[in-house]
Amino acid sequence: MSPSVNPANITYDNRVPYVTVNEVKNSPIASSVDLSNLIPGGDAGAQTAAIQQLIYMASAQADNICLGATGTLCATINTEQGRYRANRQGFIVVHPAYWPILEVDSFAIGSLPGGQTPITVSSSNCWVESRQFTVTANASTLTTVGPLDFGSMGYTNQAQFCTYTYVNGFANTTLAASASASATSIQVASATGIYAGQPLTIWDGSSTESVMIASSWNGTSTTLPINTALTYAHASAVNVSALPATVKQAVIHLVVAAIKQRGEGGLVIAEVGAPTAATSNDVTSSSDLARARDLLHAFLQVWGRT
């Protein structure tokens, strides 16, 4: 007999770091710590690998602060399930675990877990808002006096078992290939959370620029046509994101805080210019942690923190 598996456990899987190594190195926030001595005696490659590991951990910490143990700010295609009652209009209003909701792909409902009826989701029967979506009946079940039913499920005040798939979060990916100046398209590692007409930022230091996805994009290809040719050339692995810059700023603060807390060779640059050893008791990391939490406060999602 097959077990009953919570689909959410296998769909919260798109975790891409929110900053790159170069973004940390070039940030004035990180200028207070010595990034060249994270691994005592290590070469440049070892130091870069150490920064990357700190970025992974800081990105996960930012997710935990905002969404609890399982969620991520990165755009993800999530399948969740729950029990819902129809409202007085006969509509099912669903508050998924995470927001912003970008699209709803599927919905099924039934009085028993094994007897759910799939509903074909479209803009005519599914109203998507930032933090909730409403599913009405199929168009064929509407009458002059309102909706009749969801397929085989008549409206009732009893809770119904629902399973739904939706996309939420902020597009966050990297360039899968280098892009030359004047290019009219970019190739990304993932197109999840990206839509035609959407503005994205290519975060590349002094060559950072914004692009807008052209209406000619087919919605699935990882090669994204853009409305205006690139101003700068960009190397592969550069971050491409719809995330607000405050999230990046917060993650860099968390990286700096981790370095100050380590006490394993990390150096803190004093205001007078003389480096001093950062011990495990270094209290200056608290200001970076506090600043990170302040920057992430707007992204707190209570529903996903049960």
Language model segments and positions:
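Divalent metal-cofactor coordination and adjacent catalytic microenvironments
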Residues: 1-306
